[in-house]
From Swiss-Prot:
Present in the aqueous fluid surrounding olfactory sensory dendrites and are thought to aid in the capture and transport of hydrophobic odorants into and through this fluid. Binds N-phenyl-1-naphthylamine, menthol, citronellal, 1-dodecanol, decanal, p-tert-butylbenzophenone, 4-hydroxy-4'-isopropylazobenzene, 2-pyrrolyl-p-methyl-azobenzene and indole. Expressed in mosquito head but barely detectable in antennae, which suggests that it may be present in mouth structures, such as palpi and proboscis, and may have a function in taste. It is found in: Secreted. The lineage of its organism: Eukaryota, Metazoa, Ecdysozoa, Arthropoda, Hexapoda. It holds the Pfam family OBP47_like. This is Odorant-binding protein 47. Belongs to the PBP/GOBP family.
Length: 228
């Protein structure tokens, strides 16, 4: 499948994004109380973003358990073409790796912000939800009809989740450069993209999911860990 090799390279850098998305366990408690109406999958997404690498046993830190791209298991709706994502990944992954060793408030994911900027979805700490919805739904037109509702529900859940941790997101946006040339990116882009990727993959209709050991392992892994 086209671009699978490029995506495999991106998955190898998953540790960097875990650092960007991690926050504190106290925030997780508040999120879960306020988001009781969300399904278990969405709570799992909240757990990742709110706890991140706080716990030594975080299953996300080692990356995917198998050398297989998720698109080989289930092709999900997408925001941008793989080539656009890889352009952003190539530009920013060097900085992201350097940020991995930094402590304190999680820094925003510039790969994700670059993706949002490539479609003019990001501006001033805000994501254009209406435009984002149109792009995701446009990608579902040639896909199974079930994806339409799944995508809309995912968008709704992810934006609600982001709203519950807005204080932490804003704190990350107010950081100053820690090393020469560091670009400070707003955490909102990474938060939304991570949530969408995890949710869509987890909700892949059974008839569209390739059932084998590797894909089952990826599904379990990505129920806890993002793709970016």
């Amino acid at each position: 499948m086209k671009h699978l090799k490029a995506f495999d390279e991106a998955q190898n850098d998953i540790k960097a994004v875990q650092k960007r998305l991690s926050t504190s366990s106290t925030i997780l408690s508040g999120i879960q109380k306020n988001m009781a109406h969300l399904n278990l999958l969405q709570i799992g997404v909240l757990s990742l973003i709110a706890v991140g690498s706080v716990f030594a046993g975080n299953p996300c830190l080692k990356g995917p358990p198998v050398p297989k791209n998720a698109a080989e298991c289930c092709v999900t709706p997408f925001l941008v073409e793989p080539s656009a994502f890889m352009t952003c990944h190539s530009k920013w992954i060097g900085q992201t790796k350097r940020q991995m060793a930094m402590e304190g408030i999680p820094r925003g994911c510039c790969v994700a912000e670059c993706v949002m900027n490539s479609t003019s979805l990001y501006s001033n700490g805000k994501i254009d939800r209406e435009a984002l919805t149109k792009l995701y739904l446009a990608s579902t037109k040639s896909m199974a009809p079930e994806w339409n509702k799944i995508t809309l529900d995912a968008i709704d859940g992810c934006f609600k989740m982001a709203d519950t941790i807005k204080d932490e997101i804003e704190a990350g946006a107010k950081l100053t450069p820690a090393f020469e040339g560091e670009q400070i990116c707003h955490p909102i882009s990474g938060t939304i993209l991570a949530c969408m990727g995890m949710t869509l993959f987890a909700e892949c209709p059974a008839k569209l999911f390739t059932v084998n050991d590797d894909c089952n392992k990826l599904k379990s892994y990505h129920s806890k860990c993002p793709f970016l």
